[in-house]
């Protein structure tokens, strides 16, 4: 659960107080509570260590991890449509007239309210890591929307959260394209066998290469024809593999077995100690990877 699978990276745009003791109280005000009978969705904080601790924050070496849970009620459109049509047909038969659009819209709200208490719930959890040493916030999710929702919850909890997506001085896609074109990456990184190339033209095509030599003539021809690399699978120090995206996010993080097994000497029964050790190990590696990546991509954009 702890090992992050994706990274959406944000930079704190100014210094703010992020002390765990203070945060614990602030997050408690927005702790997760389940949906009521008429709620479509609810989001709040839960302990990152699950049932093993009541604490809403876990801290080590200036790194803080927190966890947001979201509950969403599932009401399939066909179910709503069927119930609404039945209600409309019944009323039209009783009143011997066609209902107006405003009346139908009002009925739809009634139908939704009647169905909500019986709807199934879908739960999801999103981990967030706050690096107070380097002034970064990382969200473990694959979509910017989900990351923004989690950041919005934190902003509401803290009262203020001045963050911007981490951005580079040079467009990331141009740097990735040059790495593939030349076959030479920044120090510490190696090309793997997967990439996505897009045409710069609005209605241009997209090429997805998998299990392919990215230095081959076929890929070079696409680049010479005007396509740029928007996603690129990379290996870092033979420790972490990931897909670098042109929006600055890292997808499909895969930690090498040697790295993941580093804390195997800790008894798995001692969940808290193992969680803490894995958290220190993971954040240490990822912080080094992010720093290496910033340098390799030509440096962070000036703010």
Curated annotation (Swiss-Prot):
Q: Which organism is it from?
A: Escherichia coli O6:H1 (strain CFT073 / ATCC 700928 / UPEC)
Name the gene for this chain: rdgC
Q: Which family does it belong to?
A: Belongs to the RdgC family.
Please tell me where this protein is predominantly located. cytoplasm
Q: Which UniProt keywords apply?
A: Cytoplasm, DNA recombination
The biological processes this protein is annotated with in GO are:
DNA recombination; regulation of DNA recombination
What task does this protein carry out?
May be involved in recombination.
GO molecular function terms attached to this record: double-stranded DNA binding
Can you tell which superkingdom this protein's organism belongs to?
Answer: Bacteria
| One Pfam family matching this protein | RdgC
Protein name per UniProt:
Recombination-associated protein RdgC
Compartment(s) where it occurs, according to its Swiss-Prot or TrEMBL record:
Cytoplasm, Nucleoid
Query: How is this protein annotated for GO cellular component?
Result: bacterial nucleoid; cytoplasm
Kindly give the InterPro entries that the UniProt entry links to this protein: RdgC
